[in-house]
Amino acid sequence: MSESQLKKVLKENETLKAQLEKSTTILKVSEACESLQDYCTKTSDPFIPGWSGENEWTKPLKGNGCSVL
């Protein structure tokens, strides 16, 4: 193997090592999906009727408050 070929191979090797090191910190898609599913199932949504009792957004207004349509 010539000197120039060796330099190219070593440079490519360093580039691949850097990419591998960088990819270890990236979150996998499956882990991100699982985290999103957990959040959605454990966090109540006030816009979904019946999720946790009466929907706060559909309750009649109390008192002399101002309502904007």
From Swiss-Prot:
Keywords: Acetylation, Cell membrane, Chemotaxis, Lipoprotein, Membrane, Methylation, Prenylation, Sensory transduction, Transducer. The gene is gpgA. InterPro entries: G-protein_gamma-like_dom, GGL_sf. It comes from the Eukaryota. One of its GO terms (cellular component) is cytosol. The keyword Transmembrane does not apply. A lipid is attached at C66 (S-geranylgeranyl cysteine). Residues 67-69 form a propeptide. The modification Cysteine methyl ester is found at C66. GO terms for biological process: aggregation involved in sorocarp development; chemotaxis to cAMP; G protein-coupled receptor signaling pathway. It is found in: Cell membrane. It is a lipid-anchor. Its main location: membrane. This protein is thought to be subject to lipidation, and this requires phlp1. Signal peptide: none annotated. GO terms for molecular function: enzyme activator activity; G-protein beta-subunit binding. Belongs to the G protein gamma family. G proteins are composed of 3 units, alpha, beta and gamma. Interacts with gpbA, and this requires phlp1. The modification N-acetylserine is found at S2. This is Guanine nucleotide-binding protein subunit gamma. Guanine nucleotide-binding proteins (G proteins) are involved as a modulator or transducer in various transmembrane signaling systems. This major G-protein of the squid photoreceptor is involved in visual transduction. The beta and gamma chains are required for the GTPase activity, for replacement of GDP by GTP, and for G protein-effector interaction. Required for normal chemotaxis in response to cAMP.
